[in-house]
Amino acid sequence: MRVRATARVEAVAPERGERLIQFLRAYKSAVQEIVNELWCLKKTPSNATLHRAYYDRLRGRGFRAHHVSEIYKRAREVVRATKSNAGSRPLLKKLTARIHPLDYKIDLKAKALWLAVLNDGWIELKLKWYDYLDKYLNGSWRLGEVLVSYKHGRVFA
């Protein structure tokens, strides 16, 4: 049996999170750019077609390979959901990035999360730990993707 649990943890970024914010803005603008291009098409392309169309372009901007795949998958999801609900062209507002398991490292003892950002850089986030998290994050659970968000001057993972 599979169980999916979500734990939201506040984090503290070094240097006021400038590199993280730069990465999140670049991520959001890349997703928005692809959304704008896909919106004009009658049929949403497959992931393989999106990969061929956007992989080299996004890698050239400094994104890691797994970031690129998450970007075009996210754009495809947004376009499909909006079109199925007969909505207008979506405009992304939140600074949120979906991080693949190979693009982060977590040390539960030190309560730190390292994220891969642009141009193969890494930043360390110190996690604000709560006692209830020990029940879930004691090393017995396999961690999947991480969503990193920046909202009102606070970072959440």
List the predicted regions and their residue ranges.
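Nucleic-acid substrate recognition interfaces
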Residues: 1-157
